[in-house]
């Protein structure tokens, strides 16, 4: 049978022809639908189906309610009546589908046989609307080229000599090559980002320019248009580095390789820890720009927080167990005070050093009469305890030498005690002559961790503020912090360098408790850069020692601490954007003070803390500091 409208002649029965006319031509036979009417479920139809089931052949007898039926092709299918109707309609509809004579694609009717567009290669942008290719005009407006199909292959039948009959063959994947290359994008008045031929749209080809004045000195010249973006980047990616005026408006000339290497050291593994001064770190100070030097120095002193916390936890457990063991052996009660750069948060390197003071838990008094500045005598306070009587002279003063020897013996017994298992990981170190500390090396027992240098210092705690000390009122910390700082002081055993009457009874006044409180909370009122400048000065000191290890010996961090506390009082503001200028001023004043041989004690101004530093060493330090400011370091 054939259709008298489209002359199609592949219909096997009238039912298929009727469906074709209804679907394609919209002609429906009167009183006949495109699909056969569904049987109503009545008693008659139910009886008929039951009879058909009973007479069904044996292979399908097990399928209750199913019959042997044939589709229009004569194929037998054991389906229900409803399934037969659906299956028949689907088969007839499939047979009515048109095929393209060239491409073989299927369509529902002749009207749908139209040229198909080829797939867009992966990664390429698809046009918003299926319009024809564009061409540029003088006004740079995109216009249509009439008569050209919008596809990957822009050839026309006339140009190729082949008539495709309105259908274009598929273009191989990735072979999209227009005859005329596209015109590259050009910048507009709005300064939009542009694209050059062959450059993916996703690539940002901008280079640092005058329109992006904020450039990161660590990320190979990454630029930022706004200062807020730049500051946010420095806080998130490089939290320990200076920002603002340090890197503003300066491109990375990629010559400072040490700067990038020092930053990589921070992100390296915890086990691969650099020493206080890396082997090639001193060479990095040949940078001509002082601001870049600040960035290098700050990046080099950043320490991983996880490593710091782990070390402190181990040391706190060790000291707690040691104190418990010592109190079990000693005939007088002891307490501990934790000091050092770990606890005031000014540590700058991986050379782990801890200082702990052990003092008797009893009332003691200090006498300052006939004592040089910074020294005092100690005697037992009003108490019934006689635990310290063996270490007193006939006048009732505590003899430093006797007390020191007793404490050193107590350290030795406690560390070798069988109940103190951590003592097996310690090794006694030889102390310098006149040093008040019992020095040990403590192995944490962690792979890759170096042994920790621990100073156990015998001391005496006095619950008052020393009379020779001035009344401090720093306006850069809160009043409560000042009150805590001036609540007490300590006395340690350090020999007075000159001949003095009763010199063997002198104790060195230690303001470790006050120093820790002030330095730890230096930024509590103004979230500024006080502690950052102190850390940078400590780094400068370490670099100077590495460059002149044989000539710089006496100058230490304690001298810097006394200088910085006074510097904090003199300068009113310490905002982060002032860091570089304040550091320059601090270096200049420090060089002058060292050259003149005078750094007064912050708490006792009459006490010169660098009196023991030789003139030759002081001259060399002043020379190094001047060279740093001049860019010749």
Curated annotation (Swiss-Prot):
Q: Is Cell division included in the keywords of this UniProt record?
A: no
Q: Which InterPro entries match?
A: Mab-21-like_nuc_Trfase, Mab-21_HhH/H2TH-like, MAB21L/cGLR, Znf_C2H2_type
Q: Where is the composition biased (Polar residues)?
A: 68-80
Gene Ontology MF: a single term: nucleotidyltransferase activity
Its EC top class is transferase
SMART domains in the record: Mab-21 (SM01265), ZnF_C2H2 (SM00355)
Q: Which reaction does it catalyse?
A: UTP + ATP = 2',3'-cUAMP + 2 diphosphate
Name the PANTHER family for this protein.
Answer: CELL FATE DETERMINING PROTEIN MAB21-RELATED, CYCLIC GMP-AMP SYNTHASE-LIKE
What family is reported? Answer: Belongs to the mab-21 family.
Q: What is this protein called?
A: Cyclic GMP-AMP synthase-like receptor 1
